[in-house]
């Protein structure tokens, strides 16, 4: 009986470790992908860069994208 309980606990621990490792290895977001809801999921060479959207001086939203680190994007007219 003790052996069955011990084996069950060991199997539970192994399954928990496998699930925890799978959660830590989520795929990262590539360049130009939306990261508004997941700012920490951009790939290592990218940063989640956000900007506000305005209409008639009032803020109407916020957009975030995975962009290259250190690159400055300017608006073209």
Swiss-Prot record:
Q: Which residues form the signal peptide?
A: 1-20
Main location group: secreted
- Transmembrane feature ranges: none
Report which superkingdom the organism of origin falls in.
Eukaryota
Where found in the cell? Secreted
Q: Point out the propeptide residues.
A: 21-26
Recorded GO molecular functions are: toxin activity
Q: What are the UniProt keywords, alphabetically?
A: Disulfide bond, Secreted, Signal, Toxin
Tissues expressing this chain: Expressed by the venom gland.
Output a single Gene Ontology CC term carried by this record.
extracellular region
Q: Name one Pfam family in it.
A: Toxin_35
What is the disulfide pattern of this chain?
none
Q: Which InterPro entries match?
A: Spider_toxin_CSTX_knottin (IPR019553)
The PTM entry states: Contains 4 disulfide bonds.
State the similarity comment. Answer: Belongs to the neurotoxin 19 (CSTX) family. 08 (U8-Lctx) subfamily.
From the Swiss-Prot or TrEMBL record, give the protein name. U8-lycotoxin-Ls1j
What is the originating organism of this protein?
A: Lycosa singoriensis
């Amino acid at each position: 009986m003790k052996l069955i309980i011990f084996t069950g606990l060991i199997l539970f621990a192994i399954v928990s470790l496998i699930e925890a490792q799978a959660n830590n290895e989520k795929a990262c977001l590539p360049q130009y992908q939306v990261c508004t809801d997941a700012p920490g999921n951009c790939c290592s060479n990218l940063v989640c860069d956000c900007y506000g959207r305005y209409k008639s001086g009032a803020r109407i939203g916020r957009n975030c994208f995975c962009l290259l680190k250190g690159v400055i994007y300017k608006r073209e007219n």
